[in-house]
Amino acid sequence: MNHANRRRFLLATGVLLAAPFAGAQPSKDKTAHVGILVMGGRAQRGHLEQALLQGLREQGYVEGKNLVLERRYLDGMMERMPDAARELAAMKLDAVVTTCTPSTRAAQQATSSMPIVMAAVADPVGQNLIASLARPGGNITGLSSQAEDIMPKMLELFASVLPKGAKVAVFVEARSNVHPRMWQALGPVAQALGLKLAKIDIKSPANVTLPAAFETAAHEKADAILVLPDEPVFLTRRALIVELAAKHRLPAFYGVREFVDEGGLMSYGENLRTAYRNAAAYVGNLARGAKPAELPVEQPTKFELVINLKTVKALGLTIPQSILIRADEVIQ
């Protein structure tokens, strides 16, 4: 989709979504029954649940009053996903919010009638989750991430703090459907920037393979780490990843700010809290009787650059003033 067409699509999406969402109130005495299916653990994702609940309050739904939220956090245990999805489908909820590709696909396989709301899922068209962004068809709608599209900009920003000819180890989730395409997209950009890339596959269990991956990166004399976005395996283990990066004194770059909040160096990507809050608008609309097939899928229009200055100093790096000025937030 070219820039002009994408702009027109986003404007149309805004009109379509704003009309039913703005100022809409729940039906009198109506209790919304909503599910959330999460690959990770609640301790690592609780702030995103709070963003969803905030958005639902803005829609007029308050937990304990006129909202029942069925939570299914799987703590990274992929094998539990199909059963959890079927369990939620059997409840005939107003909607179930899915937070990654595996949870969306599991919900899709569990039900063809109950509405499914994606919260920042990568490339739902390419993964055959929906027919198109404008008219998704079926029972899935919500928000798509654009991580694959912004990879060139992400690498360009990260390259600004690395020496020319630096070697970057790229962490790729071995089971991911989208990471292979992200990896391929990085090649030409890295060549133009004078960077060398080394792919490191992260297999299950990540708690074991992540430490080994950092050892591999160090052995291959990598100058930095790039953790590809859009995979719950990495986000759930962000504290471990940040700790290992500090241990090996490797600058590490990320696609979401949660890593930087934990002490990571730098991130560029969409704000997940905003995505979850926006997902609540879809839930509210569906609870009031809208059809998921007719609600366009929203794409992020703003991406944030976040830098942790404490980590910058600990690693002895220098961030160009031009990058600091562009940052949406600099954590002191």
Residues covered by each model-derived region:
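Short hydrophobic alpha-helices and adjacent helix-cap/hinge residues
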Residues: 1-332
